[in-house]
Every structure is written in structure tokens, then in C-alpha cells.
Amino acid sequence: MFIISSKNMLQKAQHAGYAVPAFNIHNLETLQVVVETAAEMRSPLIVAGTPGTFSYAGMGNIVAIAGDLAREYNLPLAIHLDHHESLADIESKVMAGIRSVMIDGSHFPFEENVALVKSVVDFCHRYDTSVEAELGRLGGIEDDLVVDSKDALYTNPQQAREFVARTGIDSLAVAIGTAHCMYAAEPKLDFERLAEIRALVDIPLVLHGASGLPESDIRQAISLGVCKVNVATELKIAFSDALKEYFLQNPKANDPRHYMQPAKQAMKEVVRKVIHVCGCEGQL
């Protein structure tokens, strides 16, 4: 099997003290970049897609192409449902072959979040599918969900322990000051809070909103228990900026096989950097 659960992948990372990158993809080219680069660096890989991504590119297309690339490069990988909110949607995608899920009920009150997440865990674990959930809320934009910075909430460590115990999730996404965007100013992450969560929760922790974070912050978060690092915005910016520059230099260009190459290369450099910072090169 080349499409796998992320559970063992993250447990191995937790034991060895590195993190696995989860790269959000959107189309054929971005999927090619993350798989090819991870294979070159012999890095474990999580390919992430929001509901909008699966709607745009097609669920079957993503699974089929990712599976073909994984076999071509001999690289087992997890296709991960990022920020999914519907049990029915998750059920249909798990039945189509997905084995890694994030159910996001962080916008609900605590008890509703617990109930939703528990229902997803009960279903997914029957199919050897790992489940990530979020407690607390990140600011920024993810698909069509916009969370103003004033509405962002940090994860409560004591509540995190209860949340993990009651839901049975495999990994916990924590809110410690990151956001789903590039940062206008350097963010101040609450590492003390992260350390408190780590002391109370023994499952892998997940850092969302890593685009644009200082490398030192990512490394410190990993040292405090983060085992999965999500990167999306930084990839899109690198890809689109390279496309724009290509057309500025070549205004009459019209062949995707040509203009996609610099965009893929720019994104590849970001992927290489993140793998290096996560410390997962050669960890297959």
C-alpha cells in the first residue's frame, strides 16, 4: 500500500524528535512537486487538501495521481483531509481510499466539538484511518472560513487533556499564536503553553499556519512536541510569484509545459526548506 494512514508516521516522528511536513496541494503540478521532492530527500510526506481542493481537482483524480506518483517514487504517503467539517463528507472520502483526516470543529463550543470529533473517530478507526482535531482557533483564511484575529483562541492545556481523552483522536492541532496567512509582523508564539500541553497530552501535536514562521520557531515547536507542520500559503505564493515573473519576462508565452516549470521550481525550494527545518530528511 502506498496511500497510508499518518498515525504511524507521526508516532515515529514523535519518538525520534522530528516533524512530518503536510503540504497543501491544489493541482497536478503542486502534487508532483511535493511527491518528487520528498522522494529525492527520502522524507515522509503528508499531502493535504481542503474541501475546496478536492472539489476543484476531483477526489478520484487526487487519489489516483498521488497513488501513481507514490508507486513511481517508491514513497508511501498519506493523503490528508485538511480542515474538513462534515462527517458525511469524511465518510465518503474514507470509503474512496483516504486514510488520514482532520475534523475541524474548533468553531463550535467545547461539548459540540467533542461530540463531532468523537463521531468521526468512531467511524474512521474502523477503517484504520487516523484522525486529527483542533482545539482553539487560528486566525486567517482557510478555504471560505475567515477567522478574525480577535476571534482566535489559544488552546487551553487542561481542556486539551480532556479533549484527547474523550475523543480518542490520534493527533491534536494546537493554537499557540500561528495563523492561516503570511505574517505582516513576526508572530509571538506561546511556547510555554505548548510545553504545558505536551506535558498533559501524549499524542503527536500539530502546528498549523507555519508559512512564514522563523525557522527557529518551527524547530523550537518541534522540540516541544510538534510532530506535524502544515504549510500552505508559502507554497502558493512561491508558485504564483514565479508564474507572474515568467509572464513579465515572456508576455507572449502560452505553453503550460514551459511556464509551469519555474513555478514548480520555486515551490520545490520551499518544500526542500521545510523538509530540512522539520528534520525529516532521510527518515523513510
Swiss-Prot record:
Active site: 82
Disulfide bonds: none
Cofactor(s) named in the record: Zn(2+)
Pathway(s): Carbohydrate metabolism; D-tagatose 6-phosphate degradation; D-glyceraldehyde 3-phosphate and glycerone phosphate from D-tagatose 6-phosphate: step 2/2
Residues engaged in binding dihydroxyacetone phosphate: 181, 209-211, 230-233
Top-tier EC class: lyase
GO CC field: cytosol
EC number: 4.1.2.40
Biological process according to GO: D-tagatose 6-phosphate catabolic process; galactitol catabolic process
Keyword Metal-binding appears in the UniProt entry: yes
Domain of life where this protein originates: Bacteria
Reactions listed under catalytic activity: D-tagatofuranose 1,6-bisphosphate = D-glyceraldehyde 3-phosphate + dihydroxyacetone phosphate
Swiss-Prot/TrEMBL keywords: Galactitol metabolism, Lyase, Metal-binding, Zinc
Protein purpose: Catalytic subunit of the tagatose-1,6-bisphosphate aldolase GatYZ, which catalyzes the reversible aldol condensation of dihydroxyacetone phosphate (DHAP or glycerone-phosphate) with glyceraldehyde 3-phosphate (G3P) to produce tagatose 1,6-bisphosphate (TBP). Requires GatZ subunit for full activity and stability. Is involved in the catabolism of galactitol.
Quaternary context: Forms a complex with GatZ.
Assigned protein family: Belongs to the class II fructose-bisphosphate aldolase family. TagBP aldolase GatY subfamily.
Name of protein: D-tagatose-1,6-bisphosphate aldolase subunit GatY
Species classification: Bacteria, Pseudomonadati, Pseudomonadota, Gammaproteobacteria, Enterobacterales
